[in-house]
């Protein structure tokens, strides 16, 4: 449990750095749009995202060879981690800015073949 909390805190701090210095889009429609354009570097999905939406995002991410991270908190916690006062189910990072969030994600979450 302690390890899980520590990794969640490190992801949250990296997310906050992306919000300050990087470029990102929030929401399903915008996420799918940047995935189709091939601009997304990393997708983050909350754990209570509906299964159909989750599989649709994972399918487009696989086609675009983009990493997908399943956030361990729900959409309210993901919104709070992003510094927003609303729920965020999906988030696409197009430019990480000063953050090393893309390099720091474990290999199994990136969806890429080893």
UniProtKB/Swiss-Prot annotation:
Organism: Branchiostoma belcheri (Amphioxus)
The entry's keywords: Ribonucleoprotein, Ribosomal protein
Residue spans crossing the bilayer: none
GO cellular component: cytosolic large ribosomal subunit
Record has Signal as a keyword: no
Family named by the database record: Belongs to the eukaryotic ribosomal protein eL30 family.
UniProt protein name: Large ribosomal subunit protein eL30
Pfam families, per database record: Ribosomal_L7Ae
Gene: RPL30
Superkingdom, natural source: Eukaryota
Cross-referenced PROSITE patterns: RIBOSOMAL_L30E_1, RIBOSOMAL_L30E_2
GO molecular function terms attached to this record: RNA binding; structural constituent of ribosome
Coiled-coil intervals: none
């Amino acid at each position: 449990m302690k390890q899980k909390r520590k990794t969640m805190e490190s992801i949250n701090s990296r997310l906050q750095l992306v919000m300050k210095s990087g470029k990102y889009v929030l929401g399903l429609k915008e996420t799918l749009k940047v995935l189709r354009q091939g601009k997304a570097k990393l997708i983050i999905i909350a754990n209570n995202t509906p299964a159909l939406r989750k599989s649709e995002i994972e399918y487009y991410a696989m086609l675009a060879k983009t990493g997908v991270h399943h956030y361990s908190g729900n959409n309210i916690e993901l919104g709070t981690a992003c510094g927003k006062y609303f729920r965020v189910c999906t988030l696409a990072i197009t430019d990480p800015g000063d953050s090393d969030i893309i390099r720091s994600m474990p290999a199994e979450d990136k969806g890429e073949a080893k």
